[in-house]
Regions:
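Forkhead-associated
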Residues: 63-128
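Bacterial signal peptide processing site
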Residues: 21-23
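Bacterial N-terminal signal peptides that target proteins for export
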Residues: 1-8
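Flexible, glycine-rich surface segments
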Residues: 177-236, 241
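Extended, aromatic/histidine-rich regions of cofactor-dependent oxidoreductases associated
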Residues: 161-167, 236-238, 257-259, 263-302
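C-terminal motif of bacterial Sec signal peptides marking the signal peptidase cleavage site
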Residues: 16-19
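Surface-exposed beta-loop interaction hotspot
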Residues: 132-199
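N-terminal beta-hairpin/loop module of FHA
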Residues: 32, 36-84, 234-235
Length: 302
């Protein structure tokens, strides 16, 4: 092959390569709005890294009725990670009452006070009991009729490895006004979860909105200061998490208008850890719409 043909081949290859590389769009919106979303995203990253964030979960262990010994030794009913004492103690589950008894020679703390025998409150009571030894923290969760130990390690390696979550370019066009359509009475909707079970929840109404000339509707769940929405769309399993994303909104205004800002839609905790118990979108909240806003997939899960 002569030199001129080689040069033509190189130029053609470069042209094809450059034309296949799409430049990501610049943020779209007022400077104030763009700054607001950037600040929201930064705070989201900070929350994930906290001791109470989702990044440091290292275990989820379901309890059986009766005694449940736990620690790093294989002789326990529940094996904790190797950086824990061989036997930490025992959790006794009897008729929904949970009691902790520590093993001899192990310092277990509750609110920085050493405890040897303590009644435990689960996470649904609003006054959950958290215990600690070394860098480990654990408490009881209740899901359906089951109780489990949720374990954290505040020195988990992922805290150092985690840097950020990719997001779509901020676009104020994805800040959409929806109409709240109340259900009277509130409708019971089925919410599946990652554990393979389904629970009922009250939906006070649906949120109806228009995008690209088409109408869409999402069933909302009541939250403390507005609504909580679990949804999936045509990016799910491709660019975003396959099991959907979460979105919070404010309460409806006097005209029953609710703002859906998909730029702050975010990944469920199951993206970051297999030890979370995430709800999944109800089937009616799967949208035939590509929502290119908010958080993208993190890691290798889809």
């Amino acid at each position: 092959m002569n030199l001129s043909k080689i040069i033509v081949l190189i130029i053609t290859t470069l042209f094809i390569s450059l034309s296949c590389t799409e430049k990501e769009p610049d943020p779209k919106g007022t400077p104030e709005y763009i700054a607001e979303i950037q600040q929201w995203h930064q705070k989201r990253i900070e929350r994930l890294k906290r001791d109470t964030g989702w990044l440091n979960l290292v275990g989820l262990y379901w309890l059986k009725e009766g005694e449940n010994s736990f620690g790093s030794s294989e002789e326990n009913d529940i094996k904790f990670p190797d950086n824990s004492p061989p036997k930490i103690g025992t959790i006794i589950l009897k008729d929904s009452l949970l009691t902790f008894k520590s093993a001899d020679g192990v310092d277990v703390l509750n609110n920085d006070i050493k405890v040897t025998d303590l009644e435990l409150k689960d996470d649904l009571t609003g006054t959950r009991t958290t215990l600690a030894t070394g860098s480990l923290r654990w408490y009881i969760i209740k899901r359906g009729e089951r109780y489990g130990i949720r374990l954290r390690d505040v020195e988990s390696p992922i805290l150092k490895e985690f840097k950020d979550i990719d997001i779509y370019p901020i676009n104020e066009d994805w800040r959409i006004e929806a109409t709240f359509i109340p259900y009277d009475p509130p409708k019971q909707i089925l919410i599946p979860n990652i554990l393979g079970t389904t629970e009922e929840d009250n939906s006070p109404g649906s949120l109806s909105f228009t995008k690209n000339g088409k109408n869409y509707k999402l069933d909302a769940i009541e939250s403390r200061n507005g609504f909580f929405i679990i949804f999936a769309d045509e990016t799910s399993g491709k660019e975003t998490y396959g099991a959907g994303r979460f979105l919070y909104t404010d309460e409806p205004d006097s005209n029953n208008i609710v703002t859906l800002d998909f730029n702050i839609s975010y990944n469920p905790p199951c993206v970051f850890t297999k030890y979370a118990t995430c709800p999944l979108p109800p089937k009616q909240n799967y949208l035939h719409l590509k929502i290119t806003a908010g958080e993208k997939m993190w890691g290798e899960k889809h």
